[in-house]
Amino acid sequence: MVTNHLLEIENLGQSIWMDNLSRNIIESGELKSMIGKKGIRGITSNPAIFEKAIAGNAIYDADIEAGIKASKSVIEIYESLVFKDIRDACDIFMPVYEETKGLDGYISIEVPPTIAKDTESTISEAIRYYTAIGRENLMIKIPGTPEGLPAVTRVISEGINVNVTLLFSVESYINTAWAYIEGLEARAAKGEDIDKIASVASFFLSRIDSNIDGLIDEKLKKVTDETVKAKLEAVKGKVAIANAKIAYQEYKKIIQSDRWKALSAKGAKEQRLLWASTSTKNPAYSDVMYVDELIGPNTVNTLPPPTIDACADHCDVDNRVETNIEVTKEVMENLKDPDININIDQVMEQLLVEGIDKFIKPFTSLINSLEEKVKKLTPV
């Protein structure tokens, strides 16, 4: 029998979610079969995923036509399509949610990326989405921007599950963890239950290496000294994993804090680190590098379908999230070496700005293509 390495990962305390959703895989039964066959325990989605699913796909036409007949706006039609897919996916994963007592089985949907810098709009849209979709295993994705984190606290205090997305720096993760804790504290202070609320902190990986490797390649073009070249080469493809391992160490400190212990005593669930952007962009690297190196207890890894297949086939499964911590710290310190001189904080800030933009573009594109489709399908 062929070994599915994804199932071995689960035994080490990491849940595998899939970073993909479309009506095709819902209606064909493929999504349901992935729970049993591949061990998929949840779903993440984003505007780019929905653009790919909906644009040019006739499977949505009947619902678009129904929306036109009901005189819905393009945004209302968009929401009706996406909310239906999310609701159906929630129903498919409800047995996982029940079986794991609310640890897994979540489906994530993002608030519109156009409001990433607007705290109040993020709060109201998160509550509206959660209410409209009406499933307890729904997670609302909120960007971990300075404006997004107060929204996280408020939305958690309302009893809504949150996936905090677009985290690049360790500092942004720490702030996210405390935003979750503050939300639980506020809810507990109102005398309300906190034992059913779940949250993940989505920490991005491959984009970090792509950016830093690009900077290193530029420097390598100008360097002749072999020692300096070796220093630069030694950092390539190492920063994202090092950064993630340091974040995991911070997670361990936070769950040892008195504030967390007080919440844990009331039944609160730990906010798990979720490794995101885990498809390897550089063909010189292993296609499962961001899985193999970050397996560990109380974590999630969300994988696009090609990485799921690759990992099922040849992941080298072991608990590595806490291995080589000293080497990890060294990698991050080396960035400050005058010969390397990469400002990691600047890189992280740039990636956050780009990350929001990478969601706004497909969202806008999807709304535009829906507008075109509405025009085509509207009876003259």
From Swiss-Prot:
GO terms for cellular component: cytoplasm. It catalyses: D-sedoheptulose 7-phosphate + D-glyceraldehyde 3-phosphate = D-erythrose 4-phosphate + beta-D-fructose 6-phosphate. Pathway: Carbohydrate degradation; pentose phosphate pathway; D-glyceraldehyde 3-phosphate and beta-D-fructose 6-phosphate from D-ribose 5-phosphate and D-xylulose 5-phosphate (non-oxidative stage): step 2/3. Keywords: Cytoplasm, Pentose shunt, Schiff base, Transferase. It is found in: Cytoplasm. Pfam families: TAL_FSA (PF00923). It is an enzyme of class 2 (transferase). The active site is at residue 141. GO terms for biological process: carbohydrate metabolic process; pentose-phosphate shunt. GO terms for molecular function: transaldolase activity. The keyword Iron does not apply. Its EC number is 2.2.1.2. The keyword Transferase applies. InterPro entries: Aldolase_TIM (IPR013785), TAL/FSA (IPR001585), Transaldolase_2 (IPR004732), Transaldolase_AS (IPR018225). Transaldolase is important for the balance of metabolites in the pentose-phosphate pathway. PANTHER family: TRANSALDOLASE (PTHR10683:SF31). Belongs to the transaldolase family. Type 2 subfamily. This is Transaldolase. It comes from Trichodesmium erythraeum (strain IMS101). The lineage of its organism: Bacteria, Bacillati, Cyanobacteriota, Cyanophyceae, Oscillatoriophycideae.
